[in-house]
Amino acid sequence: MAPATQPNVKWAERRGDTGGAAIASLPTPPPAQPARYALQPNLSVVAGERGGLLLCLRPLLALRLNRQATTLLGALRQPRSVAELAASVPGMTPAAITAFLDRLLRRRLLIRRPAEMTVWPQVTIIIPAHGRAEATRRCVQSLLALDYPADHREIIVMDDASTPPLAEALRDLPIRLLRQERNIGQSAARNLAATMASGTVLAFIDNDCVAEPDWLRGLLPYLDDPSVAMIGGRVVAPPARGAVAAFEAVRSPLDMGATDAEVTPNAAVSYLPTCNLLVRRDVLLAHGGFDATLRVGEDVDFIWRTLRNGHRAWYVPAGRVVHDHRVRWGDWLRRRADYGSSEADLQQRYPEGWRVMHLPRISLLLLLSVMLTPWFGFWGLGPAAVALSLFSAELTKKQRELRRVGVTLSIGRVAVALGREHAAALYHLSANAVRYYSLPLLVIGGIQPSGLPAILLLLIVAPLADHRRLRPQLSLLVFIGLYGLELVAYQVGLWRGCRQRRTLRPLLPRLIWRR
């Protein structure tokens, strides 16, 4: 859909404003230092006579390499540019090396550090705002304090029919303030501001966020790759006050974690929130901007639509904003339900986003044993015995494969690595079950009490693991309680969305069996 253009925009020009005139993009000279690649720190390259092996023990991974790949990845123990790699690996062109490195980046086996920028692009920072005058002022003040050339950035605040207007709260700040007399929503407000922006890059932030000083400098270098149209940074929480705030500090759906990743549907990072998003302006306008008919899920819709059209997106935790999360119980649960309600619409629009659910055989056999033992006593342990046999066979096979390629590891180290892999599979199964099926599973457990121990075990694995992994400032019991409340609210919203869209697609994932 085309970006919204509303005729009733009031302009309020501020000191330091460009007056809406387009600023010619500056020619970018060759970077002082090109992009550089390096192996993830948990990986090692083991060289052999016929090639080598890319080895990782956590998680367990062993990839066979030919001689060229072994030489190339061996060089990546230290950061190297494509030109440096081409000089050290005879017979591989820079294009072939780039394609190979790109495949490894997608699997999160490499780290890419972008080229150093010598000329910074013109950036327009867009803040849609409806009310929250004090928060909006704090947000703008953080942007004025950015470590970024003032003559290369423009700040637009889109006052979306705030009552009272935001002009008084922002009157002394050097920004452009645009006002809508009728509320059009965040998406339309962003689109309208984008059409009036002078920058070649649009930086979106919400008025309940505060940008850290190096926000733009941390993200913009990643646009050195012309195929990358969107970059998102990390969204962190302020110091927690209260249980919900402490929970949001570690479980917010806006925080994508501490690791760089390419953004694709069903990947570890599947979308980027608009409260911390940089987009090439020409790409946003070419693909219609944000869907103004959506009040929730518009960020996922825009990201997936742009990816579908051949562009790429990356998540980079280096560019951070601090987000003032909803911490009132009612607001928090309503927002989670709203997020859930958007899933049915998004999965209808984007079949490529169809959820995948892995079914690990060993985990399912163990759960089956827990369910059968109360009925059959000792004989109910049969599935657990089968699971142990499968694990032993897999362990023997892994040990044999490693020896075949010249890697000698003790049976204990391989067993621990393999055990972690299966524990991770159980965690992901549990996380899916808690998020989508906890209420119906508990109803089934109430009707058939013999199945309740297995159901409770399945549902408790994910919150237990997350409490240990995330280390929230909450007791285990409080964390588990909030975890359950959050996902009950999400499920209620999910079912509401399924009913509105007349589909069960979000509840019917694509199932993949795993060992």
Per-region residue spans from a language model:
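Acidic, low-complexity/disordered tracts enriched in E/D and polar residues
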Residues: 2-75
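N-proximal low-complexity "stem/linker" segments adjacent to membrane-targeting elements
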Residues: 58-60, 65-67, 72, 87-142
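Short, acidic, metal-binding catalytic loop of nucleotide-sugar glycosyltransferases
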Residues: 141-152
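A conserved acidic beta->alpha catalytic loop
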Residues: 156-167, 182, 209
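Conserved donor nucleotide-binding strand/loop of the catalytic core
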Residues: 167-196, 228, 254
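Glycine-rich, basic loop-to-helix element that forms the pyrophosphate-binding segment
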Residues: 180-197, 207, 261-270, 275
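Short aromatic/hydrophobic "clamp" motif used to bind/position activated sugar donors
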Residues: 202
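Conserved donor NDP-sugar-binding/catalytic core segment of glycosyltransferases
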Residues: 214-246, 324
